[in-house]
Amino acid sequence: MTELNKLTVADSIKGLKNKDFTSTELIGAHIKQIEKHRNLNAYVTDTFDLALKQAEAADQKYAQNNARTLEGIPFAAKDLFCTKGIRTTACSNILKNFIPNYESSVTQNIFDKGGVMLGKTNMDEFAMGSANITSCFGNVISPWKANDDNADLVPGGSSGGSAAAVSGFMASAALGSDTGGSVRQPASFTGLVGFKPTYGRCSRYGMISFASSLDQAGIFTRSVLDSSIMLEAMMGFDEKDSTSIKAEVPELQSAIGSSMKNMKIGVPLSLGEGSIIEPDIMKMWQDTIELLKNAGAEIVDITLPHAKYGVAVYYVIAPAEASSNLSRYDGVRYGLRVERENMTLDEMYEMTRSTGFGEEVKRRIMIGTYVLSSSGMDAYYLKAQKVRRLVANDFNNAFAKVDAILLPAAPTAAFKIGEKQNDPTIMYLNDLFTIPASLAGLPCASVPAGLSARGLPLGIQIIGKQLDEYNVLKVASTIESGVKHIKFEPKGF
């Protein structure tokens, strides 16, 4: 029998219903795995007592044949989802001891379906990073190793703790957030399915904000079916979020295994020209195109002429919104306060923020403050917003001809910790292929599609029309079936 912590969400639900094991046993297996792999630093707060209590309640529900859709299923939450009575820090010193008195809508939705929370996962501070190396709790180490080197690798970011937890069998699924690629890129680096739904599908209420017009909750799982199950639980209109979309939550699980006949897949191969894309990624992209063609899809050449400006646009708009959102951390109402005798209020603000924020967060606040200034507004911010509209228009034009778009999730495989962190521009380019869909608010997923020459997982990205999570899952499922001969599992786990 498969070890309990290695079961997918779907198989765990089946086993619990069949009474092959209890939720308490399932949770116990995951706790044991978490304790065994503390060195990866995936979790920053454990909630084992809560999890065992929730598991006992789940076992009673199964005994009474009254189980909900996620009854007894273990999940983890990125540490920017507020959890009532449980420390929530965004992995920043400025919030290191913050305990919310309310629950985020997304975690509440999962609890309402019977989910069991194992803990809060590590992340880049305030979700600003691509390698999970800016957390106040230290770096996250990927469970994966290259086959020619034993060096520690990054899990991707900013949701690196969630990716490491699911990839290392320390959670069946884990919540992340995706602003410019923070679910899709770590999923690619760790051999997982990472899904970012349409902007507004999941409530942002109770999510600590980075860039409000871009932030969206996402999910890490080890299968496309699991992704569909979790998305059905997470999504839904919420009147507490002004950007929440008033749309019915679709039935998604029937997308799995659906025929690709009459599906048109757009491929903007020109985006791979002259970029930093590695040869292994290019080969994986081409192989996936052939896979979908053989499955019955029609491949259509498309262009996204303004997508190449995505990174530049993103690093104007996102820091501008961050500068505004993070102005609330001033030491007055909550979080860190640095005080000295005879200190003025302005000095307290300055000391609190300079002590509490890390270097990358300070960099982005400074960029954002400048582009919102009188000299930067016309020169950068307003122009970036215009180009953002052009990027969205490119997608609209493409989707008049195709049902989904295929792109790599990242230009490279996972790299060594410390290898690129001294060059912010190189780090920002990790999101080269994920940012355009974020700017347009589109649903998209990364699904494992191959291994590099060094044995590291590579993810392909499927982008869908607004509110069309169904077709994204359909294409992802076809790709998953086509590469089922590849084992996307780190050695030693």
Swiss-Prot record:
Alphabetical list of HAMAP family matching this protein = GatA
Q: Which organism is it from?
A: Rickettsia conorii (strain ATCC VR-613 / Malish 7)
Q: Which reaction does it catalyse?
A: L-glutamyl-tRNA(Gln) + L-glutamine + ATP + H2O = L-glutaminyl-tRNA(Gln) + L-glutamate + ADP + phosphate + H(+)
Q: How does it assemble?
A: Heterotrimer of A, B and C subunits.
Task: Describe the function of this protein.
Answer: Allows the formation of correctly charged Gln-tRNA(Gln) through the transamidation of misacylated Glu-tRNA(Gln) in organisms which lack glutaminyl-tRNA synthetase. The reaction takes place in the presence of glutamine and ATP through an activated gamma-phospho-Glu-tRNA(Gln).
Q: Which family does it belong to?
A: Belongs to the amidase family. GatA subfamily.
Which residues are annotated as active site? 78, 158, 182
The GO annotation for biological process reads:
translation
Recorded name of the encoding gene: gatA
What is the name of the protein in this document? Glutamyl-tRNA(Gln) amidotransferase subunit A
Which terms in the Gene Ontology molecular function aspect does this entry carry? Answer: ATP binding; glutaminyl-tRNA synthase (glutamine-hydrolyzing) activity
Enzyme class, spelled out: ligase
InterPro entries, alphabetically? Amidase, Amidase_CS, Amidase_dom, AS_sf, GatA
- What Enzyme Commission number(s) appear in the record? 6.3.5.7
User: Where, if anywhere, are coiled coils annotated?
Assistant: none
Gene Ontology, cellular component aspect = glutamyl-tRNA(Gln) amidotransferase complex
Give the keywords, sorted: ATP-binding, Ligase, Nucleotide-binding, Protein biosynthesis
